[in-house]
Structures are given as structure tokens and as C-alpha cells.
């Protein structure tokens, strides 16, 4: 574009030079001067408009974050799946919406997901609820009973089969009228160390 401007200026300068055609009247000279000024102004305004139109979007694109600083009406409603996947991968793992889990219908599962969890224990709450060891219900008699007995307090194990009634009677006879005192775990260890010395 600048080459065209220089070429036009050279043509006007050569055609308006007094030595080329001889002495023209002052009216023609004034006419050529006005034409030259108008031509230069129009070319300069066109160049400024093109530069301002081209520079502004590049400047705005450099400044903008892909999901930010856009007018709400100009945001793309239908994002491509690749763009959506990229946005999902860039999110913090704790903030990701677990859309692929089919357990969101359960309100307790949804509330458990909103809590912060250790990374190795994520989503375990969805599979089973935590319960007090003494109040757990057996879901399967085979596999869960061994695990349940391992995790319960040794004195609170459940009896299986026909011995349930006998265990209930033994528990009633075992408990005295006074409630059992609980001790701090550290105190219990001290007492155990002292017992062998007493014998």
C-alpha cells in the first residue's frame, strides 16, 4: 500500500512540475495541489482505518483468556467436545464435576462428593456408608462377616447361628450393675506394664 502511495505522489509531482509542460496558469497549479492533498488525505485515512481494524483484534486476542472477558452475548453456546474436554482437564481435580458417575441421583452421594477427601479415598463413600462398628448390618453372610469381626472391638463380636441367644445371655450375665470405665489408651499401657511387676 505504501508503494502505491509513493507511486501516486511521484506521478503527481512529475505532472505538476513546472519544467515539464512549461508555465501553466495558477488556476491549474492550484487545482493540482488540491487534488494531491485530497488524494494523500484519503490514502492516509484508509491506511489508518485498516491499521486500527487489524491491530485491535490482535491486541484483544493476546490479552484475552479463552473463557474470560467476553460479553455474555458473544460467548459460544455450543462448544466443541475437544474444547470442553480440554477445559475439564485443566480444572483442579477437587473441583471437577463428576459427570461420568451415575450415582448422582442419590442425595447422600452428592453431599459426600462435595466434602474434601484424601486423594486415595475419593468416591469410596459412594460405594458404602460408614457406620459405627457396633451397628453395622451384615450385607453378605460369607465375605463381610470375617471383615466385620476383624474391625470390631474384641468384646463386642456378634455370635452367629444358634449361639445368638446364648451370647445374649452371657452378655447380660457378664455386665455388672456399674458401668465400665473407659481409660485413656496411654494410661492403659502404663497399667499393663505395672501388672507384671506386682506378681
Swiss-Prot record:
InterPro entries with a match to the protein in the record: TRH
Listed GO CC annotations: extracellular region; secretory granule
One Pfam short name: TRH
Residues of the signal peptide: 1-22
An example Gene Ontology molecular-function term: thyrotropin-releasing hormone activity
Region called Disordered, residue ranges: 48-90, 129-160, 175-199
Superkingdom in the source lineage: Eukaryota
Cellular localisation: Secreted
Record carries keyword Kinase: no
Record has Signal as a keyword: yes
One GO BP: positive regulation of insulin secretion
Composition skew (Basic and acidic residues), residue ranges: 147-160, 179-190
Keyword annotations: Amidation, Cleavage on pair of basic residues, Hormone, Pyrrolidone carboxylic acid, Repeat, Secreted, Signal
Sites of Pyrrolidone carboxylic acid modification: 64, 70, 91, 117, 131, 152, 183
Protein family (similarity comment): Belongs to the TRH family.
PANTHER family the UniProt entry points to: PRO-THYROTROPIN-RELEASING HORMONE
Functional summary from the UniProt entry: Functions as a regulator of the biosynthesis of TSH in the anterior pituitary gland and as a neurotransmitter/ neuromodulator in the central and peripheral nervous systems.
Name the record gives this protein: Pro-thyrotropin-releasing hormone
Amino acid at each position: 500500500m505504501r508503494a502505491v502511495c509513493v507511486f501516486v505522489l511521484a506521478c503527481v509531482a512529475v505532472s505538476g512540475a513546472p519544467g515539464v509542460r512549461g508555465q501553466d496558469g495558477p488556476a491549474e497549479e492550484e487545482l493540482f495541489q488540491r487534488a494531491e492533498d485530497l488524494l494523500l488525505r484519503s490514502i492516509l485515512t484508509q491506511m489508518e482505518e485498516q491499521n486500527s481494524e487489524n491491530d485491535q483484534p490482535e491486541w484483544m486476542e493476546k490479552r484475552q483468556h479463552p473463557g474470560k472477558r467476553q460479553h455474555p452475548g458473544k460467548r459460544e453456546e455450543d462448544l466443541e467436545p475437544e474444547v470442553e474436554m480440554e477445559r475439564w482437564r485443566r480444572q483442579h481435580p477437587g473441583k471437577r464435576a463428576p459427570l461420568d458417575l451415575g450415582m448422582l441421583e442419590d442425595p447422600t452421594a452428592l453431599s459426600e462428593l462435595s466434602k474434601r477427601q484424601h486423594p486415595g479415598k475419593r468416591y469410596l463413600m459412594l460405594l458404602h456408608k460408614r457406620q459405627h462398628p457396633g451397628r453395622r448390618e451384615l450385607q453378605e453372610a460369607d465375605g463381610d462377616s470375617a471383615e466385620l469381626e476383624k474391625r470390631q472391638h474384641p468384646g463386642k463380636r456378634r455370635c452367629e447361628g444358634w449361639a445368638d441367644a446364648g451370647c445374649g445371655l452371657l452378655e447380660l450375665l457378664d455386665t455388672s450393675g456399674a458401668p465400665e470405665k473407659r481409660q485413656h489408651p496411654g494410661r492403659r499401657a502404663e497399667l499393663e506394664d505395672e501388672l507384671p511387676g506386682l506378681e
